[in-house]
């Protein structure tokens, strides 16, 4: 008789119910989610915060303050150099690596950058892959696609970029504009008309 059986037999003789064997600890088949890299996220949020402050001030001057423009360009250049090295080590900084706020900051940085077109196109590919696996919102792909196409001298696909003409903010030329709302819907974006109203409320208040 084993030790466990002897103990249970003793409990029965004493009028106590046999003790149940302890349950084995449950093991989860799902792999643990990797922790957010706090250092990378902190750096991205710092860059984003400074960029936002300078960019808002520059917009307020209607893009005429050259000193602010130079500061903004210097910050963006430094941020892109850092992002380039980060991508070499970690890949695109999506939600899993830097959280939602950090991933959004990385996306804004590459959108605003006047870096090499080749690097921006590389980032667009990484962003598409990240969106396909649910690591960034697909809307981010639409915005960066328009940036890259315009730098290539092409019309934008999604109508995310605007310019001022005759005192009004209007979209830059759009490829096959009749189908733009369908393309925007596929990227979880509102209609072009709704987006235009938001842009004008934000940057062209009455």
Describe each model-derived feature in a short phrase.
Residues 8, 19-20:
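Charged/polar low-complexity intrinsically disordered segments
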Residues 25-153:
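N-terminal helix-rich structural modules
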Residues 124-190:
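An amphipathic alpha-helical core segment
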């Amino acid at each position: 008789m084993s030790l466990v059986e002897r103990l249970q037999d003793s409990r029965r003789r004493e009028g106590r119910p046999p003790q149940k064997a302890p349950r084995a600890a449950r093991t989860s088949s799902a792999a643990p989610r990797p922790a957010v890299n706090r250092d990378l996220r902190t750096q991205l949020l710092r860059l984003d915060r400074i960029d936002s402050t300078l960019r808002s001030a520059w917009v307020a001057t209607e893009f005429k303050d050259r000193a602010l423009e130079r500061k903004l360009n210097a910050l963006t250049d430094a941020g892109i150099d850092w992002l380039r090295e980060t991508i070499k080590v970690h890949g695109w900084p999506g939600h899993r690596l830097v959280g939602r706020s950090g991933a959004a900051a990385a996306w804004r940085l590459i959108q605003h950058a006047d870096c090499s077109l080749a690097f921006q196109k590389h980032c667009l590919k990484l962003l598409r892959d990240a969106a396909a696996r649910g690591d960034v919102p697909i809307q981010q792909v639409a915005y960066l696609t328009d940036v890259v196409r315009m730098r290539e001298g092409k019309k934008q696909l999604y109508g995310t970029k605007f310019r001022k003409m005759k005192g009004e903010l209007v979209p830059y030329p759009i490829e096959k504009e009749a189908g733009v709302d369908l393309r925007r819907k596929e990227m979880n974006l509102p209609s072009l008309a709704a987006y235009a109203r938001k842009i004008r409320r934000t940057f062209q208040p009455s």
